């Protein structure tokens, strides 16, 4: 008796993900470390100087974390209400933050009590930053004002009242100590010059502005609000360079890579998009478990920190290069160990015995071998098999149809079992690689269960969905046939006209008397 031949699972080519340099670069991070904060993480900012600690603003506290620590190395909690936008100075020695009560506080990293308190805003301060000269602080608040403060004298220098709604974001120029940019819920982004009493540039974003970013060169400005990220050319008077719409929800934060070649944006849709600053196309993306409020990159992009609405801080560190450890040298086996048995000369009376390799059958093959056809079909309709390896399910259905027992395997099923079969058909019927097998299976199911249609509302809904899917597929086929007909007509026209293009009409030769030009009257005719 011949042995059982396992079912051949038909394999299909799978298009792999395109591997780029950005994919390799941004995937080279370890598993993220998650830290639970006391509230939503509204701001994350890295110190520009070693050891590159980062400040996390959440609830009424500011935590300073070491680059690789999971516990804060310092905490600032001298806030009466919610703290906002803790930002390091360029030398990493000072930290400035706003608060819900409108007070701007300046801290020394080595101390705990605030060095300075700037009081002048009447509502919550959501954005603060140091100017390029390190001696001034810019702040924007919900009282629609932007203020410039002097650190040594603890005094207010200028107040700009040109926004008509909350000022929620801003940044100072890294090159010019007199220039800074603010974004507001009045849909505008404005650039101010401390040497004047009004804005020197204003652009219309079109949505409430949640974040702004000024390139280190000062030539480009990025604004984020709504689902849009817009890039403006400041050297051309604020001309819109490109408008990006790659998020599904509001964009809340922006960040620039260390090299300045990649722009990162975080959104409430739980995604971080990475754009090329030359083509402004998405080159990579990260997915997170909750909506994103803040985002920061450390020096040389070694660490990515993301703050979320649920108070979770996600920290990812770049993988270190594997170092080859010098292992003790093993003693090599003697030469006779390798040639043992290879130089044996077969004798005439020797009998060679080969041990056949034992083949292990899959569970569905064991069921088919024992003629348990319904059990075999049930095994390949399990959720794990249906989702991960649908080609196995299709191959078993094809094998049952080849044996002529597919109708027997599908018959006699209850509501739950037939629903699983219909769900698989709905999921995969429109795929060209599975369609020939599944269409036949669908016809058999309809023939078997047609007399009992109407007895189960769940099964009836599945049949209605299957009917709609088939009708949609028929419409697609009709459109394809119409397209093929038009293409055949075009090809026929090209063949009939020879080398003439399709869009050129080559007229047939006309009789000679119709093509000659009218005779010009002679001088004799004119005189007569």
Curated annotation (Swiss-Prot):
Q: Which GO terms describe its cellular component?
A: endoplasmic reticulum; fibrillar center; nucleolus; small-subunit processome
Q: Principal place where this protein is found?
A: nucleus
Is-annotated flag, keyword Ubl conjugation? Answer: yes
**Segments of skewed composition (Basic and acidic residues):** 511-528
Crosslink (Glycyl lysine isopeptide (Lys-Gly) (interchain with G-Cter in SUMO2)) position:
249
Write down which residues bear the modification named N-acetylalanine: 2
The residues the entry assigns to the signal sequence are none
rRNA processing listed as a keyword: yes
Task: Enumerate the subcellular locations listed in this protein's record, separating them with semicolons.
Answer: Nucleus, Nucleolus
Gene Ontology biological-process annotations: positive regulation of rRNA processing; positive regulation of transcription by RNA polymerase I; ribosomal small subunit biogenesis; rRNA processing
> Whom does it interact with, and what assembly results?
Part of the small subunit (SSU) processome, composed of more than 70 proteins and the RNA chaperone small nucleolar RNA (snoRNA) U3. May be a component of the proposed t-UTP subcomplex of the ribosomal small subunit (SSU) processome containing at least UTP4, WDR43, HEATR1, UTP15, WDR75. Interacts directly with UTP4 and WDR43.
What protein am I looking at? Answer: U3 small nucleolar RNA-associated protein 15 homolog
Protein encoded by which gene: Utp15
């Amino acid at each position: 008796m011949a042995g059982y031949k396992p079912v051949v699972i038909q394999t299909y080519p799978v298009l792999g993900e395109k591997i780029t340099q950005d994919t390799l670069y941004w995937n080279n991070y370890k598993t993220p470390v998650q830290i639970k904060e006391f509230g939503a993480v509204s701001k994350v900012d890295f110190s520009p100087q070693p050891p590159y600690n980062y400040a996390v603003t959440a609830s009424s506290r500011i935590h300073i974390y070491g680059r690789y620590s999971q516990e804060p190395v310092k905490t600032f909690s001298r806030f009466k209400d919610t703290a906002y936008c803790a930002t390091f100075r360029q030398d990493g020695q000072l930290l400035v933050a706003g608060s819900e009560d409108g007070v701007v506080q300046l801290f020394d990293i080595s101390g705990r009590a605030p060095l300075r308190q700037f009081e002048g805003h009447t509502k919550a301060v959501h954005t603060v930053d140091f100017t390029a000269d390190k001696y001034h602080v810019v702040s924007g608040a919900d009282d629609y004002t932007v203020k410039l403060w002097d650190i040594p004298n603890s005094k207010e220098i200028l107040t700009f009242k040109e926004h008509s709604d909350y000022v929620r974001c801003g940044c100072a120029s890294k090159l010019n100590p007199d220039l800074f940019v603010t974004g507001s819920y009045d849909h505008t982004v404005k650039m101010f010059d401390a040497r004047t009493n009004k804005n020197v540039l204003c652009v219309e974003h079109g949505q409430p502005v949640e974040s702004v970013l000024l390139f280190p060169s000062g030539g480009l400005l990025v604004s984020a609000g709504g689902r849009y990220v817009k890039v403006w050319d400041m050297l051309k008077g604020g001309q819109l360079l490109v408008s990006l719409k790659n998020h599904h929800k509001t964009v809340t934060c922006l960040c620039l890579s260390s090299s300045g070649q990649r722009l990162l944006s975080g959104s409430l849709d739980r995604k971080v998009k990475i754009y090329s600053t030359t083509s402004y196309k998405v080159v990579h993306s990260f997915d997170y478990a909750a909506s994103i409020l803040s985002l920061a990159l450390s020096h040389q992009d070694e660490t990515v920190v993301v703050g979320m609405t649920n108070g979770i801080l996600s920290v990812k560190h770049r993988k270190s290069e594997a170092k080859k450890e010098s292992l003790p040298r093993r003693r090599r086996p003697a030469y006779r160990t390798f040639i043992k048995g290879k130089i044996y000369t077969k004798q005439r009376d020797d009998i060679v015995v080969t041990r056949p390799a034992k083949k292990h059958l899959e569970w569905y093959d064991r069921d088919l071998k024992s003629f348990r056809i319904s059990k075999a079909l049930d095994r390949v309709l399990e959720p794990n098999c249906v989702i991960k390896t649908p080609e196995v399910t299709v191959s078993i259905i094809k094998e049952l149809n080849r044996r002529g027992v597919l109708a027997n395997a599908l018959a006699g099923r209850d509501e739950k079992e037939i629903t699983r079969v219909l769900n698989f058909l709905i999921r995969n019927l429109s795929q060209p690689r599975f369609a020939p097998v599944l269409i036949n299976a669908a016809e058999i199911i309809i023939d078997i269960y047609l007399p009992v249609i109407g007895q189960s509302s769940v099964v009836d809904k599945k049949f209605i969905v299957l009917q709609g899917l088939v009708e949609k597929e028929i419409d697609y086929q009709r459109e394809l046939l119409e397209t093929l007909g038009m293409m055949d007509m075009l090809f026929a026209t090209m063949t009939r006209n020879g080398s003439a293009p399709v869009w050129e009409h080559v007229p047939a030769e006309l009789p000679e008397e119709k093509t000659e030009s009218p005779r010009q009257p002679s001088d004799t005719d004119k005189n007569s």
